[in-house]
């Protein structure tokens, strides 16, 4: 606490000049306004908005000094990173912050977690973990960084926060190019304020002297302060400006779905792209599965010459598109909170690693329809490239087990791309019962999977295919493996800093 009568070291965000008020180039822009409106075709996807600009602040200073509802701390997955932002926050917040962080048990890349602000002027601290950057895996890094900003803002919205102070989430030691990262930061915040920002009054970008120039350069692209600045900035926008939420988009991953489900099938077929799909690695029995009809009957029709293979593929494709459309519109936050399915690093061949935690799937307690939709929502953009699945069967019980009838139905529903690009399934800590069940399932139901299943009795075996630094292990998996196979893994952290 400051001595009585001494000036406070903290800065109230309401005293800071907004981005919109900082514009001095054109005091009277009536002529340019008229001119810009005449050139409708030249409008930017990030149009001039006085309201949005009034909510944004660029401030050179320490984010820990901001007096706002919440500030953002960038850290590593164990929330113990030593960087200037974190060290300042910890110093000013006091020792209670470290105790509170221990209860969180880490934070995965792209996630956001909340603690109190303690001795800070800010009521809360939102902790997030930015990605490490490697040009080879640029798309994954972009998606993770987007998730950082998006999840911070989503948390602020859910907690009814009126003001948020952002540090620069990408840290220099993680190698993310500042300008590339700033594009993602600005467009994500812009899109969120447009769509969900009705209750957010201030978003402050707290930057260092080195970072300020980049933000000054790029802010006009996403937050133009006049119509003239909007038009002037348009040629400098990058080709990839993300989707409607600002999320990075890879062109070959985009699909077109009819906005009118009742439209004729001819029109629907014209609107669909090839190569959408899902794999069998998750859960749920859904009424949508019946949209496709009886698959065995369809196969009989094929044999009888009554239904061509091409016609069946089109019908199958339409069915998956309905699943995907529903997955994108449904609120799946309750399923996401289970942390049963998530993306981690890459295997030794550079393929994306997806993790399924069997113990986190309470089959008898959750809405299996929504679980399947969540699987599609997560996997749709993953399965366009080669990937592997790591399934932790560790310490599962009967109510975590999926029956073979459902898995067979799910396998029949998914698209060929998901099956083709799935290169391996690592079944970690199997039991005798699970090995027998898997053998029967892959022998008599889905023979195409049989050669891809690898039973892994210890984590040491898994490391021959995937480096331990590339997997985010649930703590109970590490504890079980150390108990059953020896404590050789003790040198690896439970939440590797990917």
Curated annotation (Swiss-Prot):
Residues 334-482 form the CRAL-TRIO domain. Residues 248-275 are annotated as: Disordered. Residues 265-275 have a biased composition (Acidic residues). The modification Phosphoserine is found at residue 281. Pfam families: CRAL_TRIO_2 (PF13716), Macro (PF01661). InterPro entries: CRAL-TRIO_dom (IPR001251), CRAL-TRIO_dom_sf (IPR036865), Macro_dom (IPR002589), Macro_dom-like (IPR043472), Macro_GDAP2 (IPR035793). Expressed at high levels in brain and testis, and at low levels in liver and kidney. Induction: By differentiation in neurons. Residues 253-263 have a biased composition (Basic and acidic residues). The keyword Phosphoprotein applies. Keywords: Phosphoprotein. One of its GO terms (biological process) is response to retinoic acid. Residues 43-223 form the Macro domain. The keyword Oxidoreductase does not apply. Belongs to the GDAP2 family. PANTHER family: GANGLIOSIDE INDUCED DIFFERENTIATION ASSOCIATED PROTEIN 2-RELATED, GANGLIOSIDE-INDUCED DIFFERENTIATION-ASSOCIATED PROTEIN 2. This is Ganglioside-induced differentiation-associated protein 2. It comes from Mus musculus. The lineage of its organism: Eukaryota, Metazoa, Chordata, Craniata, Vertebrata.
């Amino acid at each position: 606490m400051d001595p009585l009568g001494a000036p406070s070291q903290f800065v109230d965000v309401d005293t800071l000049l907004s981005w919109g008020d900082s514009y001095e180039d054109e005091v009277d822009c009536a002529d340019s306004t008229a001119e810009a409106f005449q050139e409708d075709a030249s409008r930017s996807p990030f149009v001039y908005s006085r309201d949005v600009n009034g909510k944004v602040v660029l401030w050179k200073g320490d984010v820990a000094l901001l007096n706002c509802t919440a500030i953002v701390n960038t850290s590593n997955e164990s929330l113990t990173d030593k960087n200037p932002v974190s060290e300042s926050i910890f110093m000013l917040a006091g020792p209670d912050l470290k105790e509170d962080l221990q209860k969180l048990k880490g934070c995965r890349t792209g996630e956001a977690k909340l603690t109190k602000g303690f001795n800070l002027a800010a009521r809360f601290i939102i902790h997030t973990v930015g990605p490490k950057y490697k040009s080879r895996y640029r798309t994954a890094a972009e998606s993770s960084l987007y998730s950082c900003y998006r999840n911070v803002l989503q948390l602020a919205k859910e907690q009814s926060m009126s003001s948020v102070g952002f540090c620069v989430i990408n840290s220099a030691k993680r190698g993310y190019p500042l300008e590339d990262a700033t594009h993602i930061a600005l467009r994500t915040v812009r899109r969120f304020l447009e769509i969900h920002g009705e209750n957010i009054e201030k978003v402050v970008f707290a930057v260092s002297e080195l970072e300020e120039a980049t933000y000054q350069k790029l802010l006009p692209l996403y937050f133009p302060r006049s119509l003239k600045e909007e038009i002037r900035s348009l040629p400098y926008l990058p080709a990839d400006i993300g989707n409607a939420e600002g999320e990075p988009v890879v062109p070959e991953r985009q699909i077109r779905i009819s906005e009118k489900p009742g439209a004729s099938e001819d029109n629907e077929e014209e609107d669909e792209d090839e190569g959408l799909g899902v794999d069998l690695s998750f859960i749920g029995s859904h009424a949508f599965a019946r949209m496709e009809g009886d698959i065995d009957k369809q196969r009989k029709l094929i044999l009888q010459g009554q239904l061509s293979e091409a016609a069946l593929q089109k019908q199958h494709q339409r069915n998956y598109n309905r699943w995907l459309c529903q997955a994108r519109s449904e609120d799946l936050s309750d399923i996401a909170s289970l942390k049963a399915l998530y993306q981690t690093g890459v295997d030794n061949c550079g393929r994306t690693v997806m993790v399924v935690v069997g113990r986190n799937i309470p089959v008898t307690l959750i809405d299996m329809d929504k679980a399947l939709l969540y699987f599609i929502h997560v996997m749709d953009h993953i399965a366009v490239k080669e990937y592997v699945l790591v399934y932790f069967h560790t310490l599962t019980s009967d109510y975590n087990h999926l029956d073979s009838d459902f898995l067979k139905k799910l396998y029949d529903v998914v698209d060929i791309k998901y099956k083709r690009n799935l290169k391996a399934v690592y079944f970690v800590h199997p039991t005798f019962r699970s090995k027998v069940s898997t053998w029967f399932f892959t022998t008599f139901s889905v023979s195409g999977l049989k050669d891809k299943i690898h039973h892994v009795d210890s984590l040491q075996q898994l490391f021959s295919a995937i480096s331990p630094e590339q997997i985010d292990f649930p703590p109970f998996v590490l504890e079980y493996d150390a108990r059953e196979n020896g404590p050789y893994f003790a040198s690896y952290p439970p939440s590797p800093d990917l």
